[in-house]
Amino acid sequence: MARPYPVGVFAPVATTFTSDGALDLDRFRANMEWYATSSLDGIVIMGSNGEYVSLSPDEKLALIEAGVKAVDGRKPIVAGTGVESTRGTIELTKAAAELGANYALVVTPHYYKPRYDKAAYVRHFHAVADASPIPVIVYVMAAYTGVDLPVDTVVEIAQHPNIVGIKDSGGNAPKVAEMVARTPEDFGVLAGSANFLYPALCLGATGGILALANVAPDACQEIVQAFRAGDHERARATQFRLLAPNAAVTTRFGIAGLKAAMDMIGLHGGDPRPPLLPLNDAERAEVRRIMEEAGILARA
C-alpha cells in the first residue's frame, strides 16, 4: 500500500498573541477558518512561522486542539512536534495525534549537532515513526538549526514506512533532484519556500510548505496548477512575480514581516513573541509596497 505522502500547497500558519504576549486562541481560530475555506491543500501548525520554539508544552497542545477543531476536517492538519529529545518528540507526536492532527512535522534535533551523525538521525526519526500513530514528515531548516541532512541520510530515513516526506527549506536544486531520484516513489519531497517552488516541482517535488501561502495561497496554487497543466510559461511567470513578496515574509523581514502582511490582507497577524521584534513603520511600508506591486494586496 502506498504511503499517504503530502501533495500540494501547505501554509505554516502564524501563532497569534495578545498585546501582553499570551496565546490569542480566538484570533487563531478566526485565521484557521479563513485557511480552511481557502485554496490550500493543508495547514501546518507550529512550523517555524508558528514560533514553536517560543511556546510552552501546554501552549502547543492548546494550539493544536484549537486548530483541529476550527478546521473540522476540511483540510489535513500537520502539527510540528519536533523537540530536542527523541522521547519528548514521541510524547508530543502522540498527543498531537490524539488531538486530531493528520501528520507530524519533525524538525531535526540540533543543539548537540557536533555529536549527531547519520546513525543518530536515522535512529531518532525511525524511533519517532515507530511510535507515531500518524505519518511523519521530516523537517530540514538549516538556516535556523545549522543541520542540513545529507541525501544519504535522507534516503535511509525515508525507508521507514511511516515516514512519508520531507520539507527541505534549503533551495538546493541538485539536492532536491537527488532526494526525489533516490527515495521511494511514495515519499513526498516538499519545497520549504515559495522562492523555489516551480524548480522543485520540475524536479519531482510533490508540493511545498510555504510561508507565503499564508497570505497568497491562490498565487502559490497558481504555480502548482499551471505546472500540472503543462503551462510552464505561466508557472514560471508566477514564480518570478512571487520572488519579492516571498523574500519579504521570509529572509528579509522574517516572521514579523509575515505577520505584518497578514494584518494587511485582513487576517490576524499581530506582533511576534519577544525576543523577536515587530516591524517598524518604514519596514511595514516596504512590505505593503512589495505586496501591492505583486498583486497580493490591492493598492490603497
Language-model segment annotations:
Residues 2-11, 16-148:
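Active-site beta->alpha loop and helix N-cap motifs at the rims of alpha/beta catalytic domains
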Residues 7, 20, 41, 46-49, ...:
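Short glycine-rich loop/turn motifs that provide flexible caps or phosphate-binding loops at active sites
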Residues 8-14, 38-40, 202-205, 209-212, ...:
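C-terminal alpha-helical cap/extension of soluble enzyme domains
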Residues 10, 28, 60, 64, ...:
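A general structural signal for well-ordered alpha-helical segments in protein cores
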Residues 25, 29-32, 151, 284, ...:
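Short, amphipathic alpha-helical "lid/cap" segments that border enzyme active or binding sites
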Residues 38, 62, 66-71, 95, ...:
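Alpha-helical structural signal in soluble globular domains
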Residues 85, 193-194, 280:
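Helix N-cap/beta->alpha junction signal
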Residues 130-131, 142-250:
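Catalytic alpha/beta core domains of metabolic enzymes, predominantly
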